[in-house]
Amino acid sequence: MASPNGGVTTYDYHDSDSAAPVNAQTIEELHSLQRKAATTTKDGASPLQSISASLASLAREYGPNLVKGDPEATKGAPPVPIKHQQPSAAAATIAASDSSLKFTHVLYNLSPAELYEQAFGQKKSSFITSTGALATLSGAKTGRSPRDKRVVKDETTSQELWWGKGSPNIEMDERQFVINRERALDYLNSLDKVYVNDQFLNWDSENRIKVRIITSRAYHALFMHNMCIRPTEEELESFGTPDFTIYNAGEFPANRYANYMTSSTSINISLARREMVILGTQYAGEMKKGLFGVMHYLMPKRGILSLHSGCNMGKEGDVALFFGLSGTGKTTLSTDHNRLLIGDDEHCWSDNGVSNIEGGCYAKCIDLSQEKEPDIWNAIKFGTVLENVVFNERTREVDYADKSITENTRAAYPIEFIPNAKIPCVGPHPKNVILLACDAYGVLPPVSKLNLAQTMYHFISGYTAIVAGTEDGVKEPTATFSACFGAAFIMYHPTKYAAMLAEKMQKYGATGWLVNTGWSGGRYGVGNRIKLPYTRKIIDAIHSGELLNASYKKTEVFGLEIPTAINGVPSEILGPVNTWTDKAAYKETLLKLAGLFKNNFEVFASYKIGNNNSLTEQILAAAPNF
């Protein structure tokens, strides 16, 4: 191009978007340049040796040949397996399986981004939603299978655990556990790759548990990445042998003709071996709740109380525990933007204070809305697992009202996704222990102060009432009792946990409260639901200490102490009898509920702690009197 003075204009290309050729000879080399190598542990073989031991066949006494990394990523490169232990002379006569001749690739503690990629390549049912969450399916099972859960009954557990009527613990023997374990391992070892997570339970560093999860699905690995406490690189280097291991072979069925099996689904726990085996169900919640059951066994042995509760802390350091079954408002009332969230579901109470067991939240999603649950709504983003939700195939927007797959739709996300989460998830000793009940009979007070015996009684009872439809279309309340507000997960007799709760409350000066979030002025269909703003005022009065200085009067039958006045709450609703126009119907309904409490408690009445029955007698004295 000519310049104004007749010369030639030259161009300076340094400011343009041109560049030197890339330093790669093949497309594979270019791909390798795209991904910067991550830092590795000081001893790269160390976790593989430990994982190989975890995957070892009990019959052959040695683990598979393991290679770290995705088989696709290492294609063309010669595998460098770890050397497994050779079998003993006694095991040498047992024929080696074909799986010992192949390499199993271990994908170890992958990041969420890596697990997304694995999930997309592994299953047609994994998609990214419009907000960045991973939507996936859990297969035929969309909830837990409590009837298929088994616990090994041996000389120790036969004496320690709660067995029989009312207990969630269904027995199996050690031999059948080992058979199921071998079945799960044979399946996992036959795969080209398995996902392994090494993580922690319990934010109290003095009492945390090392857990290893071995699974065939990337979504399960991401789920547990979110739900357990995530180790740092330094902690992984010294992780060593886990305290407990889950073998999740849920894509492979159990043998329904084997002993103790009732279906092709089987969830087995051996407390002696510190292992859990999952067959025939891909529902991720089995892993979370299985570990919770294990914590219910291990922690009380250390003098630590494990609790199925929510927990938050005020600005002054006052901690509150919230217990309640589904529909009582536990999540709503424990989520308070004026207080820090320690956890939403599983906690420990030790001499150090309270601590969250988990590193994440597993929230229900059915009918989720931004207006009602903004924290959960905003937490559903990249890294979150959305289980069994329905979404628009083009926009990928989730329809949280759609129950086509199940009503039990769930979101699993790290607790850090909640803006007011307290990290680390620990706090001082609780000042208040709040037991929530949605009483659809309408006879329990909106709030009652409990003494220690009453706290133990209502904690063991774990009461709420649901509204169930009858054949003629009339809806009647149905009482529901779940010991310790989580009977499905406890290992010991409920009285043991109740005694530990009372001991810690007395030692650290906590007060017990029973809060009814249900009906007033009549049962469901006659009275009205207690307004949420009133319940929030009650909870605020508990947190502030206002109710400690209130005047109280005692109710009949249940013998509950109810305050005569609370700021912001109409005094007439504090006494249930005041709100019923039909006083005879009130008395009849009150006695009916009291009878249901007594009938439910019969299974607990004969349990002894120590050499006498004094504690149980003390608890029974707090029962309804009529």
Swiss-Prot record:
Keywords: ATP-binding, Cytoplasm, Decarboxylase, Gluconeogenesis, Lyase, Nucleotide-binding. ATP binds at residues 324-331. Its main location: cytoplasm. Transmembrane segments: none annotated. Pfam families: PEPCK_ATP. Pathway: Carbohydrate biosynthesis; gluconeogenesis. It catalyses: oxaloacetate + ATP = phosphoenolpyruvate + ADP + CO2. Residues 1-23, 64-86 are annotated as: Disordered. It is an enzyme of class 4 (lyase). One of its GO terms (molecular function) is phosphoenolpyruvate carboxykinase (ATP) activity. Its EC number is 4.1.1.49. GO terms for biological process: gluconeogenesis. GO terms for cellular component: cytosol. It is found in: Cytoplasm. Belongs to the phosphoenolpyruvate carboxykinase (ATP) family. Homohexamer. This is Phosphoenolpyruvate carboxykinase (ATP) 2. The gene is PCK2.
